[in-house]
Every structure is written in structure tokens, then in C-alpha cells.
Amino acid sequence: MNIKRVLNEHLKWLRSEEKGSRACLRGANLRRADLRGACLRGANLHEADLHGAYLPSYKICPEKGSFRAFKALSEGLVIEIEVPSSAKRTNSLIGRKCRASKIKCITGPSKKNKCLGWLPKAGVYYYKGAIVKADSFDDDIRVECVHGIHFFITREEAEWWANR
């Protein structure tokens, strides 16, 4: 596998250019690879060996303490959440989506009732003041969509995701 070629084609794919293709680095041996400056957004890094790799600065999720963030729900709704200091949290190498083991619901668009929103596929309702816990939590930075409660650091990102 020619990593440089794969990443160049991935960049073309991100830009919607001809001959571009999404990078699939599943199971790739990236030991000691210098990935600084590489745009890995949307790349499949599942089971990739990243031991000793020089990675881009990817930590956007605060490592300690509680903090406020935004959760995209169904029908374009976005709620403000708090990630408690006791929650496990991470974000992936390939995007700006973060995830936590639990969150507290703070505010949402609904002013009339305590239900701020829902995720019908997951059967989860978000009520003002409620603590919501993930069924399980996966801290693997190589995977963007995996177990945990997903959220974004900025409202703008959450609104984009909710309305895509």
C-alpha cells in the first residue's frame, strides 16, 4: 500500500475532485508513520496499527474537568450539554465529533416542556437536567462512530451535523 498515494486520493475525495477516493487504511501498518499535516477526516482507520506513529494534534476534547458542548438530535435539533468531570471522553483522529460515557442535558429549543429532544433510532429522550449514560463507551481514537454519546465542541458544528 502506497500511503502517500492513498492520502493524496483521499484529499481529492474530500474536495470532490475527479479520481478521488475515500482512504481505507483498515488494518494498515502505520507504525512510526509521520501523519502530521495529513487530513484524515472521513478515513477508515479501523484496526490500523498506529503504534509509534507521529499523529496530528487531534485532541479537541478537554481531558479534565466538566465542560459545555452541543449535541445534535433528530429533526435538526441541537441541545446544550455538560460533560461531567467524571465522564470518560475522547474524539477521533478523523473528525471533530467527540464522545463521552455520560452527559447532563442543559438547554434546548423547547421552552414549554422538560423534553429537549430525542434520538428515535436509539430510543433515547433528553430531558432538561437529566444525566444520560451511554450503553457502553469505546475510547478508540481510530473510529469516529462507535459506542458513546456523540457531541461537538461548537454549536455551529452540531447544527451542521443536525441539518446535513
Protein language model regions, located:
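Intrinsic low-complexity/IDR segments
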Residues: 1-27, 31, 36-41, 46-164
